[in-house]
Amino acid sequence: AHSFDQMPMHKVDDEREVIEKCMTVIKDFTGKKPRGWFGPGLTQTYQTLDFLAEAGVEYIGDWVLDDQPVHVNTTSGKSVVALPYNYELHDIVSMAIQHHTSNVFRDRALDYFETIYAESHETSKVMAIAMHPYLSGSPHRIKYVRETFEHVLSKPGVVCWDGEQILDWFLKEQPAPKARKSKKK
């Protein structure tokens, strides 16, 4: 994740080349071309979405959105889906930057969940949680991760999906709009 080299996209010499390199390296290693993109440090330029769409990327996780995916049109007219991403439920932000204890992260996640779970009876919601094994997986923190997921996954209708699964569900529910090229001025 986060590109081939972890550096802001606006500082690379050739953004299109970096994206293509990432896609090629991942496909060569896994045998499968990635469908999604999570860029370095949530950075983008005005051209990033266009380059990603050209490379066949179907969804991004770079935008700090609320709790529902959205279609975003590129200048080519192709739609890319922006999946929710959340800084409030991000272990680096909560524990390493804000210096909260692990139980605060759990409590925050459960409060967030209870709110969107109640709202989800009208429309589906996505609860994005960003976790890093070296941080949340530490022996003094892992029990809070378990408690969080045990509670969340015990509720009817809740699933734990990756980006591709969320994308497939979303496209089934809300197909991409017809491609429209933007008008040049």
Question: Where do the language-model regions lie?
Answer:
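Alpha-helical scaffolding segments of alpha/beta enzyme cores, especially the outer helices
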Residues: 17, 21-28, 47-54, 111, ...
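Aromatic-anchored helix/helix-loop segment that forms the rim or "lid"
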Residues: 90-122
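Metal-dependent polysaccharide deacetylase catalytic core of the NodB/CE4 family, i.e.
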Residues: 1-45, 76-78, 84-97, 128, ...
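Non-membrane alpha-helical structural segments and their capping/turn regions in soluble enzymes
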Residues: 12-20, 99-110, 139-142, 146
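Alpha-helical scaffolding within the catalytic cores
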Residues: 63-82, 107-116
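Short, solvent-exposed turn/loop segments enriched in Gly/Ser/Thr/Pro and often Arg
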Residues: 37-44, 63-67, 164-165
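His/Asp/Glu-enriched short active-site or ligand-binding loop at hydrolase and phosphoryl-transfer sites
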Residues: 4, 53-71, 84-93, 161
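C-terminal domain-boundary segment and adjacent tail
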Residues: 59, 110-185
